[in-house]
From Swiss-Prot:
Keywords: Ribonucleoprotein, Ribosomal protein, RNA-binding, rRNA-binding
Protein's UniProt keywords contain Cell inner membrane: no
Protein's gene: rpl22
Family annotation (CDD domains): Ribosomal_L22
Organism: Archaeoglobus fulgidus (strain ATCC 49558 / DSM 4304 / JCM 9628 / NBRC 100126 / VC-16)
UniProt similarity note: Belongs to the universal ribosomal protein uL22 family.
Cited InterPro entries: Ribosomal_uL22, Ribosomal_uL22_euk/arc, Ribosomal_uL22_sf
Protein name, as recorded: Large ribosomal subunit protein uL22
Length: 155
C-alpha cells in the first residue's frame, strides 16, 4: 500500500535556509512524543541530540508539563518538577533528528547554526488488535501510532 503524501504543519519563510524531517506513524506514545517535542523546540540540533541521548541513558529527564498527573518529581529539572525518561520515544525522535541533520547537510546548510523552530507530534492511525480471553471474551489491544515532524532554520 503506497504511503500518503503528508504535509508539514509549519511552512518556513525561506525554504532554502530550512531543513525538514518527519517520522511517519511510529509506534511510540503520543503523550511522550508531545513532551519530547516541547523539550527540544528552540534548541540547536547538537543540544537536542545530547538531551535525547541522555534521556535514553536515563541521565536527564524530560519535563512533563501537560501530561503530568501522578508523575513523580525528578532531580535536575529546571523550573519544573514532574518528569520522566521516555526512552523508546526518545530513540525514535533521535532518528528523526539525525535525518533532519542529514537533510540539512545535503542542502548545504551550516548545521552548527540550525535551530529547531518547529517540533510537533500528531496522532496517526490506530492499529486495532484483540486478544482472546477465556469464556469467549476478547480484550482490545489498540496501538496508537504517532507522527513527529521537525523543522530547523539557520539563525
Amino acid at each position: 500500500m503506497p504511503m500518503a503524501r503528508v504535509n508539514y504543519a509549519y511552512k518556513p519563510e525561506d525554504e532554502t535556509k530550512a531543513a525538514k524531517a518527519m517520522g511517519y506513524e511510529m509506534p511510540i506514545s503520543f503523550k511522550h512524543a508531545v513532551e519530547i517535542c516541547r523539550a527540544i523546540r528552540g534548541k540547536k540540533i547538537e543540544e537536542a541530540r545530547k538531551l535525547l541521548e541522555d534521556v535514553v541513558e536515563m541521565k536527564r529527564a524530560i519535563p512533563f508539563k501537560r501530561h503530568k498527573k501522578k508523575v513523580a518529581h525528578r532531580r535536575g529539572l529546571e523550573k519544573w518538577y514532574a518528569g520522566r525518561y521516555p526512552q523508546k520515544a526518545a530513540k525514535y525522535v533521535l532518528k528523526v533528528l539525525r535525518n533532519l541533520e542529514a537533510n540539512a547537510e545535503y542542502k548545504g546548510l551550516d548545521v552548527e547554526n540550525l535551530v529547531i523552530v518547529h517540533a510537533q507530534a500528531q496522532k496517526g492511525r490506530v492499529i486495532e488488535r484483540y486478544m482472546p480471553r477465556a469464556f469467549g471474551r476478547a480484550t482490545p489491544r489498540f496501538q496508537q501510532l504517532t507522527t513527529v515532524e521537525l523543522v530547523a532554520e539557520v539563525r
